[in-house]
Amino acid sequence: MDNVVDRQVFYISDGTAITAEVLGHAVMSQFPVSINSITLPFVENESRARAVKEQIDAIYQQTGVRPLVFYSIVLPEVREIILQSQGFCQDIVQALVAPLQEELRLDPSPVAHRTHGLNPANLNKYDARIAAIDYTLAHDDGISMRNLDQAQVILLGVSRCGKTPTSLYLAMQFGIRAANYPFIADDMDNLNLPAALRPFQHKLFGLTINPERLAAIREERRENSRYASMRQCRMEVAEVEALYRKHQIRYINSTNYSVEEIATKILDIMGLNRRMY
């Protein structure tokens, strides 16, 4: 891309900085900018804030270009120190809170760590998410075929098409109990839907991938192997897609999608509730 510029970006918060990172990344993705990012969570006191200010100012002195600072900080005295820095500072939460305050006719009651912190109000949700993660890990890659009735979705696909990272993302981000089952090379001579999965066909969701991309991924894992050959990858993808069509299993091609996009498409297509934590 022409005219791409480099900028230093800070994501700063008195909590985990997850919100600052997510919103900051979303904003920066709109511009042809190559960024070097620094995330600084738990900036909760003036001493820590002054150290952060010095870090921002040092980069400005070195480069002559103002760092971009996306922050979410509750305490005014801590926030003020960051604002005194040589960075271009944007309060990512306040930009949304102010118009909502007017619309709701309510004053906000900001509390540090509220978004991603653990407190009595969200303890049950937290426990449910941990249970989903435990379930997903126990049912990764066909390790266990027990308790599939408890799964909310069962992902299918050839080896290295994205089943495991997608399952874990669904569990960690949305509290979804996601099992996944691999179709391996030995299955291809007589590929069929395993008997253990047939009672749960309504929960099945398939992933496929372009053979060229699959071969490149597998080559990194097992160089110059039959497993990574184009012939093998083409055959496996064709067989698995035929299986999906035969059993009317919904599926998507994961080649050009991130894990986040794959997970979101699965939630939408399967009609699963998004539970944010």
From Swiss-Prot:
* Signal sequence segment: none
* Alphabetized GO MF terms: ADP binding; ATP binding; DNA binding; phosphotransferase activity, phosphate group as acceptor; protein serine/threonine kinase activity
List the keywords (alphabetical): Kinase, Nucleotide-binding, Serine/threonine-protein kinase, Transferase
Record InterPro entries? Kinase-pyrophosphorylase, PSRP, TF_DNA-bd_sf
Instruction: Kindly state which reaction or reactions the protein catalyses.
Output: [pyruvate, water dikinase] + ADP = [pyruvate, water dikinase]-phosphate + AMP + H(+); [pyruvate, water dikinase]-phosphate + phosphate + H(+) = [pyruvate, water dikinase] + diphosphate
For ADP, which residues are the binding ones?
A: G157, V158, S159, R160, C161, G162, K163, T164
EC numbers: 2.7.11.33, 2.7.4.28
> Which GO biological-process labels does this protein carry?
regulation of DNA-templated transcription
Tell me which family the UniProt entry assigns to this protein: Belongs to the pyruvate, phosphate/water dikinase regulatory protein family. PSRP subfamily.
HAMAP family, sorted:
PSRP
What is the role of this chain?
Bifunctional serine/threonine kinase and phosphorylase involved in the regulation of the phosphoenolpyruvate synthase (PEPS) by catalyzing its phosphorylation/dephosphorylation.
This one is known as: Putative phosphoenolpyruvate synthase regulatory protein
Query: What is the native source organism of this protein?
Result: Cronobacter sakazakii (strain ATCC BAA-894) (Enterobacter sakazakii)
Q: What is the lineage of its organism?
A: Bacteria, Pseudomonadati, Pseudomonadota, Gammaproteobacteria, Enterobacterales
